[in-house]
Amino acid sequence: MAAPQFHRPSTITADNVRALGMRGLVLATNNAQFIMDNSYPHPHGTQGAVREFLRGQAAALTDLGVTHANNTFAPQPMFAGDAAAEWLRPSFGLKRTYSPFVVRDPKTPSTP
């Protein structure tokens, strides 16, 4: 499987993009030529090439997530019902991410 050449749309397939992995995909995209070579059109047009690229990118992200699934935090409940500071927080929204205190830069004057 050859690496996709982004200036030649006919070389872009989901499998080729997926085979690069996320690191290789970022490097290949950054090193891509800006000039489009119209003598190598994609069979489904430019939109088809874009669709294949996005499918390959999604598959590469999925592979990355599966590979590192054991290296991430366990999912947490969305609402912190048993939190010690529950009484300080409003009874709606994402309590786990809501800070009960307003943090301000001490150098900034407060507004009246």
From Swiss-Prot:
GO terms for cellular component: host cell nucleus; viral capsid. It holds the Pfam family Herpes_UL35. Signal peptide: none annotated. Keywords: Capsid protein, Host nucleus, Virion. Its main location: virion. One of its GO terms (biological process) is viral process. Participates in the assembly of the infectious particles by decorating the outer surface of the capsid shell and thus forming a layer between the capsid and the tegument. Complexes composed of the major capsid protein and small capsomere-interacting protein/SCP assemble together in the host cytoplasm and are translocated to the nucleus, where they accumulate and participate in capsid assembly. This is Small capsomere-interacting protein. It comes from Human herpesvirus 2 (strain HG52). The lineage of its organism: Viruses, Duplodnaviria, Heunggongvirae, Peploviricota, Herviviricetes. The gene is SCP.
